[in-house]
């Protein structure tokens, strides 16, 4: 089975912490109105010894009640349920436990993609394309591996943020003093990354790569770029087909930008935002002296299609390294490291999101720790940085 991204499921990243913080299992709640689906998801998750399903409930209201009683790291949340649906439940869940990570389980339909995007805007951390039948869930190894990988990565992120949810602190009955003294496992932050040089030439193109947590990060960054930035913006966000169409629509509505899912052969023009469509690599090639979009079904890179690395390499060839401003936002894995290294070596400029503001510091962490970034910034500073850099004198 495909995992929804046109790629085989990724293996666990090298050096990734076990469990959520190298110790206790990731604590998960499964929320779905189908008892059969809940059972299948629970078995898939508990097939990994570093995950423990501590609650399994049938609607959003039950999830809120369960979260008040349980300490959780990750919630796998269905979208359409009786009593309280997933979209309605998200703000209520985050009000109880602001740092808990929520993964939406969504069907690969336009309606499912649109609601998933609204859920991400409301605070969900990620989504997973849900198979359409219980038979597919029960027998789909790719789906199980993707689910487990995301739960473990987001569980680790929750603990690194110091957010192991303390639902037990909320009951009306007195809490034993011994319980109150318990602390979450210690978290060791990585040392500050080395910072490289800043390009001296006004860029002709802006290229952005993102994955887990990317839609929310893109909305934040692009909201600062709707005026004052004339360069074309090319974005590869790891997403399946259908979802990328909806992502472009949401960027247009929320950020006031001219965003669209890229089409093969269309020219790359100033002031437009191009989104790589799901299951295609988005490249820039030159035809008759003009830069145009080229969509390919070349093999996945870094287990991804679309992938950031081929986009970066093609932009480097089309525009020249010194004319490229690249940015890597939150995401799992190391996609973008090789392509961005080539951009920087050719004189381009690279910035990345910092660990504290990333949902998962995999992709930005890889380029930051490689020492090739001109700046490693909190999410709220990235949009203003890009705008200032892009509007500098030539």
Curated annotation (Swiss-Prot):
It comes from the Bacteria. It is found in: Cytoplasm. Residues 27-145 form the Response regulatory domain. Keywords: Chemotaxis, Cytoplasm, Hydrolase, Phosphoprotein. Belongs to the CheB family. Signal peptide: none annotated. Pfam families: CheB_methylest (PF01339), Response_reg (PF00072). Its EC number is 3.1.1.61, 3.5.1.44. Residues 1-24 are annotated as: Disordered. GO terms for molecular function: phosphorelay response regulator activity; protein-glutamate methylesterase activity; protein-glutamine glutaminase activity. This is Protein-glutamate methylesterase/protein-glutamine glutaminase. Contains a C-terminal catalytic domain, and an N-terminal region which modulates catalytic activity.
